[in-house]
């Protein structure tokens, strides 16, 4: 709806900028429903429902299956009488599609039935009329996909898009109408019963062509008109569409996007139950107290997920290099990338079902930083071939429907991040995937880096602090001979694999939350999706920084880590370490260097008296010289004036006159 505040604005043409805004708004409104489906993980099985709608908009036929999107193209078999039910132009205007399945509908119009028997018209109310439908030829004309001139020539709904000959693209007519660009072919199906026993004895058989299988706009639907090649050319309109659904997430709260945001919950302090002293039993049967039921665990907030990443990184790092975790800071970056992939080798396995796949994400995350050397599948472009140590072909069969990566690895594909590959979706001539180990983008800083930054926040450092990522540290922490980088992550010792387990669990939780947030933002057309998608992690870290749970170092949110693990109140720990370091620094100062620290009022007093004292000293030093020069200058000027006055009163005589 467009609201106009002033009637005079009707005469003004809309500017090009306003037209662009209107087009963008309309594209968001009409494309919002499709956007959520187009960006799903193409390898994840979804519930696919092919539907056939009648001219009244009712769903008269549908077929469901759980398959990856755009891989299942069944034959559609709606019945003609189900399509014409409820139309005034046919003999069953009062029936629904389900009621038209009866052999003899109730409340029959015998006068109309007599005309059908006498004149041989088509209909669905009686067996003889339905038999004539089975014996009649038909042709089909599309509504969509035509040029503007073809649309004018073929007409609209009043002619069922078959206004002139040559508009038909499919059917069973004797001239066999065909088309190289249409999305479907329509023929006669095989009835399940005779027209005397059922009202549905005229099924159609709709099959998808190769252009139809490549078409990706089935979510909005496509419409055709079907007409019978008999007197009057009666017909009906039908629409085909695809519905892709998945189990909806459960959301509690007024805002589905930000309901789960917040800092990590405080761990409640559980008081220890005092152990009673042992005494001689008064009775042979001791009294057993039932333990209270464990409280239900709430879903993790954003703070819990981020802190879980840091804690998992500490466990993995402590397993490989314990000395590095004695006293350090692990920092999360405010800006992307939040994850990095390391290409890895390893054995892959085939599976006939997706039960072993970790379907948590929807393929919306793209890795911007992938390094290493690992296993590749498909046609890898030249820009990514340096990541491939070995490229293998994909074996697709009934027993090889899904390809699983090695232990807790992922597939980084051109279509997105996925835990499994569907062999029916993967196109070896166009698609490619790289087996990677996923590692969060966490920076490592020694303990002194943040202390120096907070002790002198305004001073300009001569050298930037050195940042090491978690992937580099894990590679460097493995013994020599095993390798670094991706090889360390795959072939590392047992303690590294144990340390990576908790990190992988934390990453799976965080990735699932990030992908769900993106899906919710796409569903909400009123939110600033692009801005929030870029700053969502930054907002989460801002919650932690403002709550004192982490310390800020430029664009990073840092957690203090020692051998006991990551500290939740890192800002308080930083202040304690700064105070301790300041006290140690004051103890090492000499007696004259600590004056200002011992007497705070001395700084104010000296700064107030220093200015006047320096000015007075300057006057006493330079004042006599300035005064002497000034007096000498005045005397010279006065003498010059006197000489001029004397010359003006007296005249000089020549020597001859004097003689």
From Swiss-Prot:
Q: Where is this motif: CXXC?
A: 328-331
Signal peptide annotation: 1-35
Functional description taken from the UniProt entry: The surface protein (SU) attaches the virus to the host cell by binding to its receptor. This interaction triggers the refolding of the transmembrane protein (TM) and is thought to activate its fusogenic potential by unmasking its fusion peptide. Fusion occurs at the host cell plasma membrane. The transmembrane protein (TM) acts as a class I viral fusion protein. Under the current model, the protein has at least 3 conformational states: pre-fusion native state, pre-hairpin intermediate state, and post-fusion hairpin state. During viral and target cell membrane fusion, the coiled coil regions (heptad repeats) assume a trimer-of-hairpins structure, positioning the fusion peptide in close proximity to the C-terminal region of the ectodomain. The formation of this structure appears to drive apposition and subsequent fusion of viral and target cell membranes.
Q: Where do the record's glycosylation annotations fall on this chain?
A: 318, 389, 395, 407, 427
**A Pfam family of this chain:** TLV_coat
Cite a GO CC annotation: membrane
Chain ranges passing through the membrane: 607-627
User: What is recorded about the domains?
Assistant: The 17 amino acids long immunosuppressive region is present in many retroviral envelope proteins. Synthetic peptides derived from this relatively conserved sequence inhibit immune function in vitro and in vivo.
Q: Region Immunosuppression: what ranges? A: 533-549
PTM comment: the record says:
Specific enzymatic cleavages in vivo yield mature proteins. Envelope glycoproteins are synthesized as an inactive precursor that is N-glycosylated and processed likely by host cell furin or by a furin-like protease in the Golgi to yield the mature SU and TM proteins. The cleavage site between SU and TM requires the minimal sequence [KR]-X-[KR]-R. The R-peptide is released from the C-terminus of the cytoplasmic tail of the TM protein upon particle formation as a result of proteolytic cleavage by the viral protease. Cleavage of this peptide is required for TM to become fusogenic. The CXXC motif is highly conserved across a broad range of retroviral envelope proteins. It is thought to participate in the formation of a labile disulfide bond possibly with the CX6CC motif present in the transmembrane protein. Isomerization of the intersubunit disulfide bond to an SU intrachain disulfide bond is thought to occur upon receptor recognition in order to allow membrane fusion.
Question: Which residues face the membrane's Cytoplasmic side?
Answer: 628-659
Q: Where is this site: Cleavage?
A: 463-464, 643-644
Oligomer and partners: The mature envelope protein (Env) consists of a trimer of SU-TM heterodimers attached by a labile interchain disulfide bond.
Residue ranges of the motif YXXL motif: 650-653
Q: What else is known?
A: Koala retrovirus is both a circulating virus and an endogenous retrovirus of koala, except in some isolated populations in south Australia.
**Disordered, as annotated region:** 278-301
Q: Which residues lie on this side of the membrane: Extracellular?
A: 36-606
Q: Which SUPFAM superfamilies match?
A: ENV polyprotein, receptor-binding domain (SSF49830), Virus ectodomain (SSF58069)
Q: Which parts of this chain are annotated as the region Fusion peptide?
A: 466-486
Q: Where is this motif: CX6CC?
A: 550-558
Protein's UniProt name: Envelope glycoprotein
Lipid attachment in record (S-palmitoyl cysteine): 625
What InterPro entries does this protein's entry cite?
Answer: FMuLV_rcpt-bd, TLV/ENV_coat_polyprotein
Keyword field:
Cleavage on pair of basic residues, Coiled coil, Disulfide bond, Fusion of virus membrane with host cell membrane, Fusion of virus membrane with host membrane, Glycoprotein, Host cell membrane, Host membrane, Host-virus interaction, Lipoprotein, Membrane, Palmitate, Signal, Transmembrane, Transmembrane helix, Viral attachment to host cell, Viral envelope protein, Viral penetration into host cytoplasm, Virion, Virus entry into host cell
Q: List the disulfide bonds.
A: 141-162, 154-167, 328-331, 328-558, 550-557
């Amino acid at each position: 709806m467009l609201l106009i505040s002033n009637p005079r604005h009707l005469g003004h043409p809309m500017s090009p900028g306003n037209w662009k805004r209107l087009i963008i708004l309309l594209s968001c409104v009409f494309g919002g429903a499709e956007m959520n489906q187009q960006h799903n993980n193409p390898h994840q099985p979804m519930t696919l429902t092919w539907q056939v709608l009648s001219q009244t908009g009712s769903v008269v036929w549908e077929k469901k299956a759980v398959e990856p999107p755009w891989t299942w193209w069944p034959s559609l078999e709606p019945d003609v009488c189900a399509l014409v039910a409820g139309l005034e132009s046919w003999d069953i205007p009062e029936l629904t599609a389900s009621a038209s399945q009866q052999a003899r509908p109730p409340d029959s119009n015998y006068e109309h039935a007599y005309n059908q028997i006498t004149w041989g018209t088509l209909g669905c109310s009686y067996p003889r009329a339905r038999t004539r439908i089975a014996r009649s030829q038909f042709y089909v004309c599309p509504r969509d996909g035509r040029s503007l001139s073809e649309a004018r020539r073929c007409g609209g709904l009043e002619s069922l898009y078959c206004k002139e000959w040559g508009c038909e693209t499919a059917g069973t007519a004797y001239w066999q109408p065909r088309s190289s660009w249409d999305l479907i072919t329509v023929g006669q199906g095989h009835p399940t019963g005779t027209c005397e026993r059922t009202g549905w004895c005229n099924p159609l058989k709709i099959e998808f062509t190769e252009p139809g299988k490549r078409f990706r706009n089935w979510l909005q639907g496509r419409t055709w008109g079907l007409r019978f090649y008999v007197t009057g050319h009666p017909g009906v309109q039908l629409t085909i569409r695809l519905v892709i659904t998945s189990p909806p997430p459960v959301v509690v709260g007024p805002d589905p996007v930000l309901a789960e945001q917040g800092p990590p919950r405080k761990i409640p302090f559980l008081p220890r139950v005092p152990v009673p002293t042992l005494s001689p039993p008064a009775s042979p049967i001791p009294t057993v107290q039932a333990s209270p039921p464990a409280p239900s665990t709430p879903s993790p907030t954003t703070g819990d997920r981020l802190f879980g990443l840091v804690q998992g990184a500490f466990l993995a790092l402590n397993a490989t290099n314990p000395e590095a975790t004695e006293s350090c800071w692990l920092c999360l970056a405010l800006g992307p990338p939040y994850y990095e992939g390391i290409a890895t080798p390893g054995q892959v396995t085939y599976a006939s079902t997706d039960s072993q796949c970790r379907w948590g994400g929807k393929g919306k995350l793209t890795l911007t930083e992938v390094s290493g050397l690992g296993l590749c599948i498909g046609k890898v472009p030249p820009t990514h071939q340096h990541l491939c140590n070995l490229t293998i072909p994909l074996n697709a069969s009934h027993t090889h429907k899904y390809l699983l990566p090695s232990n807790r690895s992922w597939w980084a594909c051109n279509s997105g991040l996925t835990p499994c590959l569907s062999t029916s979706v993967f196109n070896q001539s166009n698609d490619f995937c790289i087996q990677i180990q996923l590692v969060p983008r966490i920076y490592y800083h020694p303990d002194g880096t943040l202390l120096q930054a907070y002790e002198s926040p305004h001073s300009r450092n001569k050298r930037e602090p050195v940042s090491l990522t978690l992937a580099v540290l894990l590679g460097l922490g493995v013994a020599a001979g095993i390798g670094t980088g991706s090889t360390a992550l795959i072939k590392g010792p047992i303690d590294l694999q144990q340390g990576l387990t908790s990190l992988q669990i934390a990453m799976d939780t965080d990735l699932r939350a990030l992908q769900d947030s993106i899906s919710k933002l796409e569903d909400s057309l009123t939110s600033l999706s692009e801005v929030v998608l870029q700053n969502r992690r930054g907002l989460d870290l801002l919650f932690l920084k403002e709550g004192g749970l982490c310390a800020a170092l430029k664009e990073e949110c840092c957690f203090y880590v020692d051998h006991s693990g990551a500290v939740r109140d890192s800002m308080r720990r930083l202040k304690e370490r700064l105070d301790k370091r300041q006290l140690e620094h004051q103890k090492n100062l000499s007696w004259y260097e600590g004056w200002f620290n011992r007497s705070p009022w001395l700084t104010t007093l000296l700064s107030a008296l220093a200015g006047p004292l320096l000015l007075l000293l300057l006057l006493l030093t330079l004042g006599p010289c300035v005064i002497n020069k000034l007096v000498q200058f005045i005397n010279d000027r006065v003498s010059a004036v006197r000489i001029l006055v004397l010359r003006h009163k007296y005249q000089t005589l020549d020597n001859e006159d004097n003689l």
